[in-house]
Swiss-Prot record:
Function: ATPase component of the chromatin remodeling INO80 complex which is involved in transcriptional regulation, DNA replication and DNA repair. Binds DNA. As part of the INO80 complex, remodels chromatin by shifting nucleosomes. Regulates transcription upon recruitment by YY1 to YY1-activated genes, where it acts as an essential coactivator. Involved in UV-damage excision DNA repair. The contribution to DNA double-strand break repair appears to be largely indirect through transcriptional regulation. Involved in DNA replication.
Subcellular location as annotated: Cytoplasm; Nucleus; Cytoplasm, Cytoskeleton, Spindle; Chromosome
Phylogenetic lineage: Eukaryota, Metazoa, Chordata, Craniata, Vertebrata
Biased segments, Basic residues type: 220-232
Protein family: Belongs to the SNF2/RAD54 helicase family.
Regulation: Activated upon binding to double stranded DNA or nucleosomes.
Pfam families registered for this protein in UniProt: DBINO, Helicase_C, SNF2-rel_dom
Gene Ontology molecular function: any one: DNA binding
Residue ranges of the region described as Assembles INO80 complex module with putative regulatory components INO80E, INO80F, UCHL5, NFRKB, MCRS1 and IN80D: 1-268
Stated name of the protein: Chromatin-remodeling ATPase INO80
Summary of subunit composition and partner proteins: Component of the chromatin remodeling INO80 complex; three different complex modules assemble on different domains of INO80. Interacts with DDB1. Interacts with transcriptional repressor protein YY1; the interaction recruits the INO80 complex to YY1 target genes. Interacts with YY1AP1. Interacts with tubulin alpha.
Length: 1559
């Protein structure tokens, strides 16, 4: 092969040397010595020491009878590999040496060469091989053969076989390295060549400690010993088979030899000894193996047969025993069955007694409930009269007060007292059944109550007058003492002041006080006169002018009048909400500066300091330390013990609607204060519940109700909810309470008294929900179960109160979504999860020697220098070939673009930075060339004498080339030639004109996506992975890479080019600086940070209301308006604050958390500073008492349930002092719950208007139905109701059909069972009748359900009617279904009332029907009926006589009898309850109650039945064994003698045939 590769084409000696890789390959494949040694070993006879093998002494290496398959070719060494044929005889090695050991060496010397210290049994064969001397002769013989044979070359096929062996070797080496089991043999033979043998240590490390040897291993070793002995014995007897065995061992090596076996190979015959040995071996195997195996099989078959026989015997025994047990069970079943039937009868009668007791209790309970109901009605009537009495008494008191004030006549006193007369003397109640029951009324004397009411009113009036007189006298004495203590004279008023002789008459007009700085309007002056008149008469009042009409000013003017005209300088107590405290203080300071006002608020320490001025000695004069105390409701409750020490001349309660609850602590505390007069100020209409009206009445007239605790008890029962069906009475009482309040209340509205106020315009602004709001709104709506809402709205009153709060929570969720989705679900700041990765460490050795660029150090030289087509030498040779032929050169274009071969090589081989710089330089060159061609002047010649290198560059003249794009402004704005945004598109836009209403449509304008929508951030971020190496050069290289490489590379990355970097450093000194390039010119849409903060634009665009508010505020600010924005939710005000900051609107905020001092300063700043555009207020905190007339626009972001609250809020701007027109905007989301809330607020406003004007009354509480109507649209509610009714109807219909089917199936099943049982009894011939034995414990019951007789002395069954249910139904039937149409028809035959046979076979013949006797039917005895006569009772179908066969069918009707008994008992109980109820009132019932009732029979009982209880022949409560038996009718009356005489006849006929007429 080498000779073929080395042969040249022409055989010349000038051939170049072979490539190095071929030389390396030939040297690596030099295998001659290995092949020679291997062939010598393989061709040597293994058993050469035996003399019987017939070896040839002349040729010891080639046996005579050896197998030629194992002969391996011996090839001479290859001369091309640098060896000669005589290399083996060069004397380097002894030709007769083996493994470097001479043949003459002894075994002891060989043993010193190896380490056999740790050699165990498993490796002893290695020792025998290493110490053997068998290979010396083979080596000498192989050397002789090498000299004799001629040189042979290695064939190609053998080379391929060797390569394949090499491949197999690699494959198995890989398997060895991966398999743990194979790795234990790592030092199997190599350990013998070293001083330390690590084989066993390696094996122990991989396999672990030795496992315990189990018995199986011991057995296996014993078997292995036997096999070895057997093999040894076989080898002794068959020594001739060794060549064949030798052939088998060398089969593995023979397959590498390509010589075919000789065709004529003779088969060797065995000797007799060999055959005997084989025969003996066969017999031994038969005796040792086959015979025990056959014996085992036979014994196992016998055991299996015995086992199966035993199982079969057990099964047969079980079957026989089961049959015997069944027979015994059948024999013993009679007595337990009888006992069971006895127990069932006992349970039946116990159940009967229980049902009877329950019906009796139910009747008593119903009668008791009826009595309770009548008692409640009487109590309600009594309470009604009592309330009428109290209201009449209050009207009389008010009449006395108004008569004194108005000096009127006394003509209406009788009219008031006439209301106590009660014209109704009796009451009729209609009870079911058509019976009218008259209930006697309790005695009521109207004259007595008239006198009592008049007396109480006069006493209360006199007590009030006396209390007022005593208070005035005490105040007079205190004031006189204070005057005497002061060293002053002529203080203005003397001591002659007295309320008994008022100086001002009731009709005289009082002028405005002189100490009041200001001008009162006409209606305000009238209000002050009315208040002064009330004070003179000692009457408390309510000033209820509409908000903004100056209630505060009128109150201050009244106090100034008292100080100026009456010399009453206090002390006055002003109590108001916290939001209006500063307003009261400012108004006092502004209008009456002579008053010393003491603001009582602050922390406990400040209030303690203020209370130092509270001295009783220094009060009541003009020189007192204070005249007026202003405080809040909360502080009054906290410091009540200090306020009760002072006797207040006048107490003014601002926003008096806070006192509407008489059970509150505030109401009770303020009622106990010592004061001469009380004045309540309220701008809202009087509330429309009786309890709230009475609370105001009691507060202004405490003397009238001091002794009447029953009034409180009356309202604590909540009479409105208790008597819902008596609304007419409530309306009458409510109108009377309003009439009582009229003399003590003054109310004016703006449009009636004030024409100077500007108009107020209210505008509803409807907003659309955004997509996010719609999704949230629909999600909330889907979570609501319409059925649950409807069910909760239709529940009881108690359930309605419980569900209203949960429904209101749903309403608040919907309102949050309408206001802003951020209230429901806030968008939080988003940031990815950031982690810091640890740097991975690289060892210094790997860094310096293991990297690819270091490992392949010659790669760059080969690829970039020697083999690269862009090498400068190659480009030069391609352009200038030595033969002068350069037509096919691929680099001929370089001369036309002015690029040298070196520049081309740099572009292609020096990396990306060189190309980038070259591109930058080429763009500059193209720009210069473009300028040169565009602005160069022609030289006058027609053509040039030569062409320049750049004349062939045509790209510069292209219209969209870089120089043209830079120089032309129109080309810069092209789509693909200018810088674009990250995300943009082209859509149509409508452009509106500013000064006209026209608009135009512009198509395909560049549209940028909003920045808050461009959010594409990773979920996890990390610092780029760094490396660390303990090497100085590695750290230097890492630092260079971190800095961006070289300076030029860094400048290109940041600025785009080195020249641009220089310009960037000097940009501040340039007038027109160059735009930045590289990374500095990149501006990401959301910045370089991945943290995403929700934009304020999304805050506006996510809410339809806030978007509408944004547009509205922009317009209002441009027009110079000032705005008040009201909202009920504090979180919504927080969002509005964020919006104001974003839009840069100047604003202020006031809510419930603002302090009192801050509220005063904020209101003052808003009134005085014009730069504040918006005032954010909460509806509850900022809607009371403050003056914000500087604003002319009010915006309600969300509406309140109560329209009065919104009215108060908008009147903060629309009040006295407002000169501009006030515009009120109300933001409403269209199609949502807010529309329905606004509608309800309008309805409520109308109701309040009607109530204050004395109209009808309507409760002011939200019911569940109303809340459900807010949650659902009317159409949706109607649709849901229709669907629900349709589903309910379908469900009822399907249930009815299923019930009918179930009953029919049950009836058919029972019928089938009864027929089967009847047939079985007919076959067995069972027809037993147990004789009648009267007993008291009902023990005469049959065991098998046969005929038995009703004992005479048994308990009387509950009668129901003349025809019982059990006699109507067929045998084994079920209770009748009223909706079923397939039941039996009951025939009422007149002939059935004919005389019947006395001597009938029915056991019930001893009893008779009492109902006919009671109803007046004559009783007579008739002869017995014959065979031809029918023995049917009245109302029974024809052929329904009783037979023994029919009696046998009645034993399976237990449940039917029980249900019949329950129904009959229920009917009887209902009748008894009705009778008992009527009897409780002393009336009898003429009809409507069954004549068989126990009550009726006990009243009208025939004389002939004195010895027997009334028992109906068709009673459903008969014996359960007679259920379904058709019992014929009996005579109307029987005597004891006739019944006893017929006893024997009954017993005789019980065994005979059936009576006539029976089936």
């Amino acid at each position: 092969m080498a000779s073929e590769l080395g042969a040249g084409d022409d055989g010349s000696s000038t051939e170049l040397a072979k490539p190095l890789y071929l030389q390396y390959l030939e040297r690596a494949l030099r295998l001659d010595h290995f092949l020679r040694q291997t062939s010598a070993i393989f061709n040597r006879n293994i058993s050469s020491d035996d003399s019987e093998d017939g070896l040839d002494d002349n040729n010891p290496l080639l046996p005579e009878s050896g197998d030629p398959l194992i002969q391996v070719k011996e090839e001479p060494p290859n001369s091309l590999l640098g060896e000669t044929s005589g290399a083996s005889s060069s004397g380097l090695l002894n030709p007769y040496s083996l493994n470097g050991v001479l043949q003459s060496e002894s075994k002891s010397d060989k043993g010193n060469l190896y380490n056999f210290s740790k050699l165990k049994k498993s490796r002893k064969w290695l020792k025998s091989i290493l110490l053997s001397d068998e290979s010396s002769e083979a080596d000498s013989q192989s050397e002789d053969n090498d000299d004799e044979e001629e040189e042979l070359s290695l064939s190609r096929e053998e080379l391929h076989n060797m390569l394949r062996l090499h491949k197999y070797k690699k494959l198995h080496q890989n398997k060895y390295s991966k398999d743990k089991e194979l790795q234990q043999y790592q030092y199997y033979s190599a350990g013998l060549l070293s001083t330390y043998d690590p084989f066993y240590e390696q094996q122990r490390h991989l396999l672990g400690p030795k496992k315990k040897k189990f018995k199986e291993d011991k057995k296996l070793k014993a078997k292995l010993k036997k096999v070895k002995k057997k093999r040894r014995r076989d080898e002794e007897f068959s020594s001739e088979e060794s060549p064949r065995h030798h052939h088998h061992q060398t089969k593995v090596f023979a397959k590498f030899s390509h010589d075919a076996p000789p065709p004529g190979t003779k088969k060797k015959h065995l000797s007799i000894e060999q055959l005997n040995a084989r025969r003996r071996k066969v017999w031994l195997s038969i005796v040792k193996k086959e015979l025990p195996k056959a014996n085992k099989q036979k014994s196992s078959a016998r055991n299996l047969f015995l086992t199966n026989s035993r199982k079969l015997a057990h099964q047969c025994m079980k079957e026989v025993r089961r049959a015997a047990l069944q027979a015994q069970k059948n024999c013993k079943e009679t007595l337990p069955r009888a006992r069971r039937l006895t127990k069932e009868m006992l349970l039946y009668w116990k159940k009967y007694e229980k049902v009877e007791k329950e019906h009796r209790k139910r009747a008593e309970k119903e009668a008791l409930e009826q009595r309770k109901l009548d008692e409640e009605m009487r109590e309600a009537k009594r309470q009604q009269r009592k309330l009428n009495f109290l209201i009449t008494q209050t009207e009389l008191y008010a009449h006395f007060m108004s008569r004194k004030r108005d000096m009127g006549h006394d003509g209406i006193q009788e009219e008031i007292l006439r209301k106590l007369e009660d014209s109704s003397t009796q009451r009729q109640i209609d009870i079911g059944g058509g019976v009218v029951v008259n209930i006697t009324q309790e005695d009521y004397d109207s004259n007595h109550f008239k006198a009592q009411a008049l007396k109480n009113a006069e006493n209360a009036y006199h007590i009030h007058q006396a209390r007022t007189r005593s208070f005035d006298e005490d105040a007079k004495e205190s004031r006189a003492a204070a005057l005497r203590a002061a060293d002053k004279s002529g203080s203005g008023f003397g001591e002659s002041y007295s309320l008994a002789n008022p100086s001002i008459r009731a009709g005289e007009d009082i002028p405005q006080p002189t100490i009041f700085n200001g001008k009162l309007k006409g209606y305000q002056l009238k209000g002050m006169n009315w208040l002064a008149n009330l004070y003179e008469q000692g009457i408390n009042g309510i000033l209820a002018d509409e908000m903004g009409l100056g209630k505060t000013v009128q109150s201050i003017a009244l106090l100034a009048h008292l100080a100026e005209r009456e010399n009453i300088w206090g002390p006055f107590l002003i109590i108001s909400p916290a939001s209006t405290l500063n307003n009261w203080h400012q108004e006092f300071t502004r209008f009456v500066p002579k008053f010393k006002v003491l603001p009582y608020w602050g922390n406990p320490h400040d209030r303690k300091v203020i209370r130092r001025f509270w001295s009783q000695k220094t009060l009541y004069t003009q020189d007192a330390p204070f005249h007026v105390v202003i405080t809040s409701y909360q502080l009054v409750v906290q410091d009540v013990k200090y306020f009760q020490r002072v006797k207040w001349q006048y107490m003014v309660l601002d926003e008096a609607q806070a006192l509407k609850s008489s059970s509150s602590v505030r109401w009770k505390i303020l009622l106990q204060f010592q004061c001469r007069n009380r004045l309540l100020l309220t701008g809202t209409p009087i509330q429309n519940t009786m309890a709230e009206l009475w609370a105001l009445l009691h507060f202004i007239m405490p003397t009238l109700f001091d002794s009447h605790e029953e009034f409180n008890e009356w309202f604590s029962k909540d009479i409105e909810s208790h008597a819902e069906n008596k609304s007419a009475i409530d309306e009458n009482q409510l109108s009377r309470l309003h009439m009582i309040l009229k003399p003590f209340m003054l109310r004016r509205i703006k449009k009636d008294v004030e024409n100077e106020l500007s108009d107020k315009i209210e505008i509803l602004t409807y907003c659309q929900l955004t997509s996010r709001q719609k999704l949230l709104y629909q999600a909330l709506k889907n979570k609501i179960s319409i059925e649950d809402l409807l069910q909760s709205s239709m529940g009881s009153t108690q359930q309605a109160q419980n569900t209203t709060s949960s429904l209101m929570n749903l309403v608040m969720q919907f309102r949050k979504v309408c206001n802003h989705p951020e209230l429901f679900e806030r968008q939080e700041t988003w940031s990815p999860f950031h982690i810091s990765l640890k740097p991975y460490e690289i060892s210094k050795f790997i860094y310096r020697h293991g990297q690819i660029r270091v490992f392949n150090h010659s790669r760059d030289r080969w690829l970039k220098v020697l083999l690269s087509p862009f090498a400068p030498d190659y480009i030069q040779q391609s352009l200038f070939h030595r033969k002068g032929i350069n037509e096919g050169s691929c680099f001929s274009f370089l001369r036309f673009i002015d690029v040298s071969p070196a520049e081309m090589a740099n572009l292609m081989l020096q990396g990306l930075l060189a190309r980038w710089l070259a591109l930058f330089l080429s763009l500059k060159a193209s720009y210069r060339l473009h300028q040169l061609r565009s602005w160069a002047e022609p030289d006058g010649t027609s053509h040039q004498s030569y062409l320049r290198n750049k004349d062939f560059l045509l790209g510069v003249d292209f219209p969209l080339s870089f120089p043209n794009l830079c120089s032309c402004p129109l080309l810069k704005s092209l789509v693909f030639s200018s810088h674009c945004k990250a995300v943009s598109g082209y859509s149509d836009h409508v452009v509106h004109q500013r000064r006209s209403a026209t608009s135009s449509l512009r198509c395909c304008l560049l549209t940028e996506l909003p920045s808050f929508l461009c959010v594409a951030s990773p979920r996890v971020t990390a610092v780029p992975l760094d490396s660390y190496c303990n090497d100085r050069s590695a750290e230097y290289e890492r630092g260079v890479l971190k800095e961006g490489g070289s300076l030029a590379a860094k400048q290109c990355l940041l600025n785009g080019a080195p020249e641009l970097a220089t310009d960037w450093l000097s940009r501040r000194s340039q007038f027109f600086p160059e735009p930045a390039g590289g990374l500095l010119s990149i501006r990401p849409q959301n910045g370089w940070s991945f943290i995403r903060i929700p934009g304020k634009e999304s805050l506006i665009t996510d809410s339809g209301k806030l978007y509408a508010l944004d547009v509205l505020l922009t317009r209002l600010k441009s027009q110079g308006h000032r705005v008040l924005i009201y909202s009920q939710m504090t979180r919504m005000i927080d969002l509005l604050e964020e919006y104001m900051v974003y839009r840069k609107h100047t604003y202020m905020r006031l809510d419930g958390s603002s302090k009192i001092s801050e509220r005063r300063d904020m209101v003052a700043d808003f009134q005085t500073r014009n730069d504040i555009f918006v005032f954010l207020l909460s509806t509850r905190a900022g809607g009371l008492g403050i003056n914000l007339t500087a604003a002319d626009t009010v915006i309600f972001y969300d509406s309140d349930w109560n329209p009065t609250v919104d009215q108060q809020a908008m009147d903060r701007a629309h009040r006295l002092g407002q000169t501009k027109q006030v515009t009120v905007y109300r933001l409403i989301c269209k199609g949502t719950i807010e529309e329905r809330i606004l509608q309800r607020a309008k309805e409520k406003s109308e109701i309040q208007r009607m109530v204050i004007s004395g109209g009808n009354f309507k409760p002011d509480t939200l019911k569940p139905k109303e809340v459900v109507s807010l949650l659902l649209d009317d159409e949706e509610l109607e649709k849901k109701l229709r669907l629900r009714q349709e589903e309910k109807r379908q469900q009822e219909e399907s249930n009815r059909v299923k019930e009918r089917k179930r009953k029919r199936e049950k009836y058919a099943e029972k019928k089938k069972k009864e027929d089967e049982l009847d047939g079985k009894r007919r076959k067995e011939g069972v027809n037993l009748v147990i004789p009648f034995v009267p007993s008291a414990d009902n023990s005469n019951l049959s065991a098998d359900g046969d005929d038995s007789f009703i004992s005479v002395d048994s308990a009387m069954p509950s009668p129901f009617s003349e025809i019982s249910i059990s006699s109507e139904l067929h045998t084994g039937s079920i209770p009748p279904d009223e909706s079923s149409s397939d039941m039996l028809v009951i025939v009422d035959d007149p002939a059935s009332s004919a005389p019947q046979s006395r001597a009938t076979n029915s056991p019930a013949s001893i009893t008779g029907s009492v109902s006919d006797t009671v109803n007046g039917i004559s009783i007579q005895e008739v002869p017995a009926a014959g065979r031809g006569h029918s023995a049917r009772s009245r109302g029974r179908p024809k052929g329904s006589g009783s037979t023994a066969k029919g009696a046998g069918k009645g034993r399976s009707r237990k449940s039917t009898a029980g249900s019949a008994a329950a129904m009959a008992g229920a009917k009887a109980g209902a009748a008894a309850a009705s009778a008992a109820a009527y009897a409780a009132y002393g009336y009898n019932v003429s009809k409507g109650i069954s004549a068989s009732s126990p009550l009726q029979t006990s009243i009208v009982r025939p004389a002939g039945l004195a010895d027997f209880g009334p028992s109906s022949a068709s009673s459903p409560l008969s014996s359960p064994l007679n259920k379904g038996n058709n019992i014929p009718g009996t005579p109307k009356s029987l005597h004891m003698t006739s019944s006893l005489a017929s006893d024997s006849l009954i017993r005789k006929q019980g065994k005979g045939t059936n009576p006539s007429g029976g089936r």
